[in-house]
């Protein structure tokens, strides 16, 4: 970590974790019983200066799993009609196989050893993702089983607001409320917000940290 070039590599920024921004739209709040209806996944990249940004986004409309509960209030809120054939929905398994493939490829390219979900109010998205993976009996998930980066918490600290739309606007990121509650739109705004916070922290001198030996040397000089 004493080498500034190493500190500008993604694999060193988050302890070997590759951040993957996710947003889901669902038919309720219960990941055990309610349908996952839409998911978007934004992959990130870091340039040679250590600035993190958006790489690409995957987006899937999802068929409700067999026996899934569909709460009318949730459908009215997100405007999704699960029966609409124009959605082009795929099964949970098909979507997650594609997501796993893309995430693992990007994770490997960044020389990271595991991926970590980034989301706004991350416990919600992480819960639905984890339950879908379990239902599909998919092995070797790239995602950490419980750790996440929650942009609601990060925004509360860095910007002073926890609502996604308000935090984005305060950070100078355009946000159209008419587009909100689309997994694709919300994921990319969440990704922009996460990148803004990480890059802002770096620009203020919060990263990279001094290595222990550098700190010791500096303390010795000052003494």
Swiss-Prot record:
Keyword Magnesium recorded: yes
Residue positions binding Mg(2+) 1: 23
Active-site residue list: 181 (proton donor/acceptor)
GO molecular function, one term: 3'-5' exonuclease activity
Cofactor(s) the protein needs: Mg(2+)
Pfam family, one: RNase_T
Stored PANTHER family: DNA POLYMERASE III SUBUNIT EPSILON, RIBONUCLEASE T
Subunit organization: Homodimer.
Role description: Trims short 3' overhangs of a variety of RNA species, leaving a one or two nucleotide 3' overhang. Responsible for the end-turnover of tRNA: specifically removes the terminal AMP residue from uncharged tRNA (tRNA-C-C-A). Also appears to be involved in tRNA biosynthesis.
Protein's name according to its UniProt entry: Ribonuclease T
Protein's organism: Shewanella baltica (strain OS185)
Gene that specifies this protein: rnt
